[in-house]
Amino acid sequence: MTYQTFFLISDPDNLDYPIYIVYDKSRVLDYFGDIFYTQSTTITEIELGDTNPDFKISILHNNNYLTSHVIKSTKYSLLDVNTVQMLLDYKDPDYELKSTCHLYIFYMTKNRFDICDYLIASNIKYIDSFGNISLLNSTNLNNYQLIKYIIDNNEFFNCRYYYLMLGILRYTKFYDLVDYILELISKSNNHIDYNSLLMELFSKFDCMGSLINSEIDAFQIKKLIDGNYFDEKVLFDTVICNNFELTKYLVEKGFNYDFDTIINSNVKFDVLKYFIELGNYLTDDHIYMILCNTSCEYYEKIIYLVDNNHITEKYFTKSIISRIIHFEFYLLDYLTNKLNIIELIDLDLLMKTSIRCNETVMVKKCIDYGINPDEYMEFAIKHDICIAKKLMELGGNIPDNMCIYNPDAYLTIESIDIILENNYDSLENLLPKIINNCDSEIIMYIIKKLTDTTIIIPHGLIKIFIRSYYWGRGNDIYSGIINSNLNFDDYQQIIIGIMRKEYNKIEQLIFSSTYYNSIELLFVVTLSENIELFKLLLEINCNDNNYLSWAFVFSIGCFKLMKYIVDNYNIDIYQRQFEVCIMSLQNYYRCYNQSDQIKFYLLLMGYEISCFNNKKNYNENIPLVKFMREMGVTLV
């Protein structure tokens, strides 16, 4: 391997302990995805620094490697055609490239179509394992010259005109390119299913399942409509369900339509209103169909139809009213004010639904309609003290065998206030349940309640604080903690002090406490990435091998901590390899900027790449998994 030629695409971020990814000269063309990702426009020829005593090398993929030392030689510009020819010359004639999509995309996005021509002339095929998805994504399609180049060279790229049209119509306003494709199709044997194209244009998701963040350009669709590219029925059925502007355009052009079809299609409110205002007559069947279909802007439709006297009491049934209670509860208040439908209402269903929704207005209406509030007090108490209290104010009486306060009911900010103001329970007793519910809004509220009190903070709340610290310092709970004035005990003061970055105070607290060997405290210190506190804990616990092994596992979140413990303590880095790999994956989501370097370092030290991302390792008996679950941290 000493005499092989390798290339370096970019320098590593951490130059204090650099780990280089180097590429076999004969395979660089296969790795233009990495070049495209880094946006590097140069490539450096290197020799491996295998004369260095600390030299290490490990295979990363088939033809690229990780190494700790390189000797840089010559830098080449990737925008120079001579460099491209050099890479072509290095390629083994018998080797078939696995992927060249990013090779071509790299040069097209740089507007170096001359180099693309050179690659085509050199018989470098366009290869994309995902078809043409990489080529026809929304970013590339914003480049007019790039799309034009693909169209002009489509015999080489072999893109279906269907997907070219779809991408251009979906993401651009390059109208002349649509006309250009239509002209090319007319001169060839190619055919586009324009009806399928139209339906796919209105899809909210692309072929990879990603949400499409673009609006349909009605102008270009109108041109295709005028050119009679669509079947009239497919066109009308598709448009009325998706685009009001195009719906009006079709009607104004004189398209024949069936009003029954429009009603059956459960169109949006603006479309329904438009056709009614055109003078189309709503039959009884139409109205029943609208009333029974409680989706697609139902609330707006029913209010409009009632306000304009298209719907009266005669159209409602008990079944329809019950559906409204279930699916459009807040519509019922409007309907009962406008129409005489009380006899159709299942008052028991309405009362229970009103209690579940904490809707005092509807509860009062039910009582006005004859409901006995006493019969629903037990139901209300089990649900929420707030609505139970309101029911009492409306004349309800608590059963002799019950108390208005139900300790098992779900807590809200309003219910907590009622409980505390009426001395139904104490904040100390409520805290464990609040902690278990782990509602961030309620916890923030409780932090304010606890401020400047003498109430001792339970350890469960500290675990929530640590969890908020773990997932990111920009969240509300973390911000609330560091700005609060709570009654913390000695251990909690250490934890909170770390979060507040009061490191000078913390050292003395650790020395004078019995918590110096706490694994939980060690975890928080590694989250802080403070090297001095980390050194202090290691120094105090230097003879505890179990503690040191935990320190190594937790340090995987921060390269400088990990490197320190490896360099200064006799750690067996392979003893807990599964746990280290689990921690590495967690940190991929927490601190992506460090995760690759840590992973590469471990690979250089002999870790198997198959160990990473292997969720079969998440055995509950593994100490790290058990610890994280006790902390309430969900493993990803």
Swiss-Prot record:
ANK repeats lie at residues 63-97, 99-129, 130-159, 161-190, 230-259, 261-284, 322-355, 372-400, 425-455, 517-546, 548-575. The keyword Repressor does not apply. The keyword Oxidoreductase does not apply. Keywords: ANK repeat, Repeat. This is Putative ankyrin repeat protein L766. It comes from Acanthamoeba polyphaga mimivirus. The lineage of its organism: Viruses, Varidnaviria, Bamfordvirae, Nucleocytoviricota, Megaviricetes.
